[in-house]
């Protein structure tokens, strides 16, 4: 992103915050294409549905698209003819994908430049380890043990597209770009709402950009009201969210909110409140009573219904008591567990025992959901019995083995933070036996005969990588003991959720 931003630093259009001229410059499409490939290489599973965009990209297509945008009448085509009437061998949907990627990348670059300028003069420590998904778990272990209740909320969508356009007004100052953006949405798609899952046929980068804009908008309102209703000042809001005319926009909302709910801001005061957003959801943790959690619950329901015009049912907001309920958080089932301890204290000639109870956050592996993901991808049946992967039998033996080993290591890597690894060993067993059955099916042999012919060395690949990592972390004597079975390890290099973890 820093390299791409350099192309925009000395551009006259950027000095005036005009984005519309960038749609007619070829080098911007090259930057967008390179940015897309970088994200594709980091997380290929998200962008597999749009592989045609990367295969068909060329400078000649960009020139044709620019010429077509100069003649906007040629862009206006009925929705039913979106995949028909190909222009120079390409459908209109393909050209819309190019425009959507370009718009998302341009606004993202501009927002990163603006965000970088807000950090100037502020002494902020940058830690790349905080980018890891696992970095949030040590924080929760330290904080959630003091809390009683957690509000688990699924961020609602779809949302009306016109509200998204209005939201982008506070990031994009150029009216021409906003008009062009609205034109593309309504002329090409003719949608009323944004639904990422149903519109997955189009570009995911573009829809993730729209979705993140929607989340950023509601979070800015939430943080603003939280700051007004709390005695503690929040410094992160000022640094992380730069809003243009935000206070002018929020003034009307606050007036309506306070008039309709006169006691809400006072009742929502709670200095011990933690908010964590993740994967289309967020949790709100507090040590207060269920009454306060219900007030926050109906506050969010009214916020989305009144301000964002999204019909949101209160049943989608779950209030979990950590001592009794499991919290489904980033692929783990987390709950508070009482760990009794007996401490012997001796003072002079007298000794006595002290019973102490330590509250500990227990993160368990959701074996049922992972088996459901494995069954969905044809690694096993719904009961967890391994089956052969028929679609991989045309590949080479080394390719099949390496792919199974990589999947097994990724799952083991992600769930290393659980103390009870019995479920993890069961998942690894399913993958190993599935690998053997796949290879045996390819060679038209039985599993017993195949293992007898190749020996046990075939499965050593599943253990080599994990053993090397753990041997570097722990002493050899400790690594060889059974105590390693209950050791929790949080890795700080996990940036994305695995598809098997992301099962719904």
Swiss-Prot record:
Location(s) in or outside the cell: Plastid, Chloroplast
A GO biological process held by the record: mRNA processing
Cited Pfam families: Intron_maturas2, MatK_N
Keywords recorded for this protein, A-Z: Chloroplast, mRNA processing, Plastid, RNA-binding, tRNA processing
GO MF assignments: RNA binding
UniProt feature coiled coil, ranges: none
GO cellular component: chloroplast
InterPro entries assigned to the protein according to its UniProt record, in alphabetical order: Domain_X, Maturase_MatK, Maturase_MatK_N
PANTHER family for this protein: MATURASE K
Function: Usually encoded in the trnK tRNA gene intron. Probably assists in splicing its own and other chloroplast group II introns.
Family: Belongs to the intron maturase 2 family. MatK subfamily.
Name of the protein this chain belongs to: Maturase K
Native source organism of the sequence: Alliaria petiolata
């Amino acid at each position: 992103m820093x390299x791409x931003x350099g192309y925009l630093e000395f551009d006259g259009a950027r000095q005036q915050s005009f984005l519309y001229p960038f749609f007619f410059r070829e080098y911007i499409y090259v930057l967008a294409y390179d940015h897309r490939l970088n994200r594709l290489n980091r997380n290929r599973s998200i962008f597999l549905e749009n592989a045609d965009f990367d295969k068909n990209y060329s400078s000649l297509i960009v020139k044709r698209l620019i010429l077509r945008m100069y003649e906007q009448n040629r862009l206006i085509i009925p929705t039913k003819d979106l995949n028909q009437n190909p222009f120079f061998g390409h459908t209109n949907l393909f050209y819309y994908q190019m425009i959507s990627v370009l718009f998302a990348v341009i606004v993202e670059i501009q927002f990163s430049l603006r965000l970088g300028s807000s950090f100037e003069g502020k002494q902020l420590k940058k830690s790349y380890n905080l980018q890891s998904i696992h970095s949030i778990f040590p924080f929760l272990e330290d904080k959630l043990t003091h809390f009683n209740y957690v509000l688990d909320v699924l961020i609602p969508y779809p949302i009306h597209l016109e509200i998204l356009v209005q939201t982008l007004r506070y990031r994009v100052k150029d009216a021409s770009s906003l008009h062009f953006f609205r034109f593309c949405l309504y002329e090409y798609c003719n949608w009323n709402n944004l639904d990422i899952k149903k519109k997955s046929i189009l570009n995911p980068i573009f829809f993730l950009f729209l979705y993140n804009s929607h989340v950023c908008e509601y979070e800015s309102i939430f943080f603003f009201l939280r700051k007004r209703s709390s005695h503690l000042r929040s410094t992160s809001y000022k640094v992380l969210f730069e809003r243009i005319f935000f206070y002018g926009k929020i003034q009307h909302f606050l007036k309506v909110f306070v008039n309709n709910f006169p006691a809400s801001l006072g009742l929502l005061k709670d200095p011990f409140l933690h908010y964590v957003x993740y994967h289309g959801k967020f949790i709100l943790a507090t040590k207060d009573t269920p009454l306060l959690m219900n007030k926050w619950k109906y506050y969010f329901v009214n916020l989305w219904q009144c301000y964002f015009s999204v019909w949101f049912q209160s049943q989608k907001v779950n209030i979990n008591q950590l001592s009794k309920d499991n919290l489904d958080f980033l692929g783990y089932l987390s709950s508070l567990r009482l760990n009794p301890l007996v401490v012997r204290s001796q003072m002079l000639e007298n000794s006595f025992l002290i019973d102490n109870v330590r509250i500990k956050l227990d993160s368990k592996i959701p074996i049922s959901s992972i088996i459901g993901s494995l069954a969905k991808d044809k690694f096993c049946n719904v009961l967890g019995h391994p089956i052969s992967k028929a679609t991989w039998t045309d590949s080479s033996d080394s390719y099949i083995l390496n792919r199974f080993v990589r999947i097994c290591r990724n799952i083991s890597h992600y769930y290393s933070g659980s103390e009870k690894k019995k479920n993890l060993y069961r998942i690894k067993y399913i993958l190993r036996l599935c690998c053997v059955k796949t290879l045996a099916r390819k060679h038209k042999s039985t599993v017993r005969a195949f293992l007898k012919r190749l020996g046990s060395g075939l499965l050593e690949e599943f253990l080599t990588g994990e053993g090397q990592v753990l041997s570097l972390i722990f002493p050899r004597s400790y690594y060889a003991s059974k105590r390693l079975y209950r050791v929790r390890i949080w890795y700080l290099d996990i940036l994305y959720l695995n598809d098997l973890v992301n099962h719904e």
